Regions:
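NTP-binding/hydrolysis catalytic cores, primarily Walker-type P-loop NTPases
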Residues: 221-261
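Structural beta-sheet core signal
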Residues: 58-59, 141, 178-181
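Beta-strand-loop-alpha "switch" segments that mediate conformational coupling across diverse proteins
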Residues: 183-226
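Extreme N-terminal, non-catalytic leader segments
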Residues: 1-29
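P-loop/Walker-type NTP enzyme "switch/lid" segment
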Residues: 20-35, 42, 46-119, 123, ...
Length: 261
């Protein structure tokens, strides 16, 4: 039995995946710490594994502190792998782009069924030093409404565009960038984020409102009780996010300015 088996009652499994035979590569990233990258990456990965039990989901932790891998080791099984990516990092802690790219290529070339590769990146991620980003299908950028979060996210997105321009990647072939308003208190918080990114040619995802249960998501307790509470309290959000990752919900065409989903 899956260690998170009870969650499937809330996030029903699906067999109608609409994804590339090469699999899907997802990155949760922002240069700012404390915006919820790891938590969203972990819960989204488990959500995909729960809804699509025939697929392989691999979560790669790019943090030297092993935040994600330590939290999720007790959830790992034959279809949900948690990888500590020490071999994918340089001694400085920066990403080893060559090794990460090799891992992505090998994962995509593996023809053992449907696959999702999820990267959880640490605070301080610099796009101009992270060329492996170009191999991702989706880049989810979590942030809250604070001024520091918004300023850091502006810088992060600007560097992302510099990377695309430097590498000469056509606009329609760039990874899809989706900003995720996270742990917001009111609709006005969401509107503040929307106004601050209105000129960016990216997508604005749904907002996740503040939940105390998120803070307890991965406390060691031997069961999936905390996850069950999270999925119950915010089911629509996780259904939307996993549908987007799986390809069940497709994105509109490349936006000319901020496009709200």
């Amino acid at each position: 039995m899956s260690p998170w088996g009870g969650v499937s009652d809330l996030l029903p499994s699906k067999d109608d995946l609409n994804i590339s035979e090469e699999g899907t590569t997802i990155l949760f990233a922002n240069s700012k710490g404390g915006v919820g990258k790891s938590t969203l990456a972990l819960i989204a990965s488990l959500g995909v594994a729960t809804r699509y039990p025939e697929a392989l989901v691999q979560l790669v932790d790019l943090d030297k502190q092993s935040t994600s891998s330590d939290a999720l080791n007790n959830f790992a099984n034959s279809r949900f792998e948690v990888v500590n990516a020490k071999k994918m990092l340089l001694d400085s802690g920066l990403p080893n782009n060559a090794n990460i790219s090799k891992h992505i290529n090998a994962f995509k070339q593996d023809n053992q069924g449907r696959r999702f590769l999820v990267f959880d990146s640490p605070a301080g991620t610099e796009p101009l030093r992270s060329s492996f980003i170009l191999k991702c299908d989706f880049i989810f950028v979590p942030l809250s409404v604070g001024d520091a979060d918004i300023h850091a996210t502006h810088k992060f997105l600007d560097e992302m565009q510099e990377l695309f321009h430097y590498e000469g990647i056509p606009k329609d072939l760039c990874p899809k960038i989706i900003v995720l308003p996270n742990m917001i208190d009111t609709r006005s918080d969401f509107d503040v984020i929307r106004r601050n990114f209105i000129e960016y040619q990216i997508y604005l995802g749904r907002g996740l409102f503040f939940l105390n249960s998120i803070r307890r998501a991965f406390r060691r307790q031997g069961t999936d009780t905390n996850l069950h509470v999270i999925f119950e309290q915010s089911k629509d959000y996780w259904m939307w996010l996993t549908d987007l990752i799986s390809g069940k919900e497709s994105l509109p065409g490349t936006p000319d300015k901020l496009l709200q989903l």
